[in-house]
Amino acid sequence: MGQHPAKSMDVRRIEGGELLLNQLAGRMIPKGTLTWSGKFPTIDHVLDHVQTMEEINTLQQQGAWPAGAGRRVGLSNPAPQEIPQPQWTPEEDQKAREAFRRYQEERPPETTTIPPTSPTQWKLQPGDDPLLGNQSLLETHPLYQTEPAVPVIKTPPLKKKMSGTFGGILAGLIGLLVSFFLLIKILEILRRLDWWWISLSSPKGKMQCAFQDTGAQISPHYAGSCPWGCPGFLWTYLRLFIIFLLILLVAAGLLYLTDNGSTILGKLQWASVSALFSSISSLLPSDPKSLVALTFGLSLIWMTSSSATQTLVTLTQLATLSALFYKS
């Protein structure tokens, strides 16, 4: 009870061959459901199928399993039958030749004939080298005689936007306005320094212009405020020019000390200025329109405020411009 008869060696060989073929043919079966909606095997599945069939054919040719082992994959007949070749008798061959000859004779001749075209004559002049890119060979070809070498595509000119033009004009006017008021403020600072210089060298009660009693028909005025026509007008602007040169000399000296870094003063001054400019540049907006609006607002405050506030606003404007150059 419960015992099965022993299998023969041939049966075991057939079962082993079937297991081998099932493993090889497993990759040929696509995974998932195949429907008529358009799901096709992937390229990987096709390549696996080709490789598997090559392995199966190789094993089949080598006789790796006995006859009958490949019945599950349709390999019941390992040796394929040869396709029979048609055999022609001499009579049938003669009939075929006669039929082809009659067809050639009865076929109507062609009505349209294409005249033979002569090859293009290339003109090679002495000294021309086609490998060097000369145009002599191409110019003789009819294809290059009617068409330009480089196609030219004409595009209509782009129309300028009114908003961009108006923005550029507005930015230019604001820049001119700021430059004008900065120049006026620099002249005012130079006049105050000139007035301080005159007050050091002259008594407080004698601040009148010394050139107004030389016969010129001008109203009384203080030194440093000479109008046009007074002999002291040129001397006033000469002093302003000297003061401006002294300020530039001091600034150049500070820059020289800063670049060399030979003194502690230069290092401290450079560190303080760098920290100031970095802090100001971090507070500045990155949008150019916001920077223009900030400068314009400072200019309006400068025009409508007192002298002390004007000085602070001017220093703020100079620091802002310096921070912009430092940031860029």
Curated annotation (Swiss-Prot):
Residues 2-161 are annotated as: Pre-S. It holds the Pfam family vMSA. Glycans are attached at residue 260. The keyword Electron transport does not apply. Myristoylation contributes importantly to DHBV infectivity. It is most likely required for an early step of the life cycle involving the entry or uncoating of virus particles. Phosphorylated on pre-S domain for about 50% of L proteins, the L chains with internal pre-S region (Li-HBsAg). This is Large envelope protein. GO terms for biological process: membrane fusion involved in viral entry into host cell; symbiont entry into host cell; virion attachment to host cell. One of its GO terms (cellular component) is virion membrane. The record marks 238-239 as: Cleavage. The chain crosses the membrane at residues 164-184, 237-257, 283-303. The gene is S. Large internal envelope protein interacts with capsid protein. Keywords: Fusion of virus membrane with host membrane, Glycoprotein, Host-virus interaction, Lipoprotein, Membrane, Myristate, Phosphoprotein, Transmembrane, Transmembrane helix, Viral attachment to host cell, Viral envelope protein, Viral penetration into host cytoplasm, Virion, Virus entry into host cell. Residues 92-109 have a biased composition (Basic and acidic residues). The keyword rRNA-binding does not apply. It comes from the Viruses.
